[in-house]
């Protein structure tokens, strides 16, 4: 048995101080953090998906600016920092501010009151938030004689959650008032760092702070959040060995599975280093289990606000393209679905050519989560109605139980092509392909639609751990099961997969031409 009992992983811990004092494993980013704090620009903005380590980064910066040298013993920063100046820090965590103007005001009032007490600011009863913020910055400087570090974490949380509600404009107005102060207080500020997921350019953070440097795409900061493959192999060997032992894998097989599930993020066209989702990776290694941790933590809750009719569009996103100007500078509310999906972590950079980014799904966890999210809207059924059937379909495909798998598939697609009016613009076979590929993706299979081979185009290839399913679909009024069977035999659709170690199963499937569902199937 691999011993990992003496190693603590920082599951659910966002405090750098707590990570260090409890002796938790810490992936050392302090050399990059020191460069950002000392060699970067004064005003910095970093966008990364939710649960990607932004808050730990902000907390580490706070500990650094507060001069807490003891927390950094043994880390890379000790070779770089010589002075350890303790300076005043103003930190705001806007994820605690709710999604209504009243809750935003309440949070700012409470946060400012704490800072006013610390820096002995006399507050007039009629003072606006902008005046109070200005006075806090000046008082912190005057009391210490040192310029202030200002850290604003998850700045966009109230704006994102209030988007497309009556509260959004009022929340935006508060932001314009308060954060315009940052520019006028330049001489009192040492370093300003703002994190978020999505970019709302109409607020004063971006319109007033014309010197705000968006470091989100800079190559030197590509891995400032998240965990690289090199760091995984260096820091997590005992946990990977334990996972391998539990699952009956070799070490390399365990790494390959972790990579397929949680790796694949890229944040700079000039530094395409692979980055793992840290939340999912650390949870998976702590549990010795591969699950959809990031998605199940609420990651998909904002999708309906930003992506209309997503159930019809998912296949268009992998791959998709977006102009450099759009992805690097545009407001999320006007940049299209691709921009939101990139900023929030559902798409990542796959390549770059002549001013155009190529985007795609980063990994299996994200892809499955997206398809799982849209399946109820596509099938016109609730999650509760289809989850049991989905589970049975997945198990049947894993075991090669064709009769049970086709029974489940028939139940899931019954009447859907006919009943879902959003599909009306598609021809009937196209509707079936969309519905079936969404179902297979949602249960975690690897799916290729209309796969080209030397002899023709296969309607669908569905892969599980033990099986490769080659599907040919035919409508009842287009020859049905007999035509599908004949085409598979003549064109030898299963032949290119025979070298695969997995069992290859060729399936001819007949579908009702009126959209009522699966009529018949046959193993070829």
Label each PLM-derived region with a short phrase.
Residues 1-428, 443-445:
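Phosphate-binding site recognition
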Residues 140-144, 439-465:
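Active-site metal-binding core of divalent-cation-utilizing nuclease and nuclease-like domains
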Residues 149, 467-469, 505:
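Structural motif
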Residues 169-175, 475-494:
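Mg2+/Mn2+-dependent nuclease catalytic core
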Residues 178-185, 339-347, 437-442, 487-507:
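Metal-dependent nuclease catalytic cores in nucleic-acid-processing enzymes
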Residues 436, 460-462, 466-477, 491:
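Conserved catalytic cores of phosphodiester-cleaving nucleases, focusing on short active-site segments
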Residues 496, 500-524:
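Domain-level recognition of nuclease-like catalytic cores that cleave nucleotide substrates
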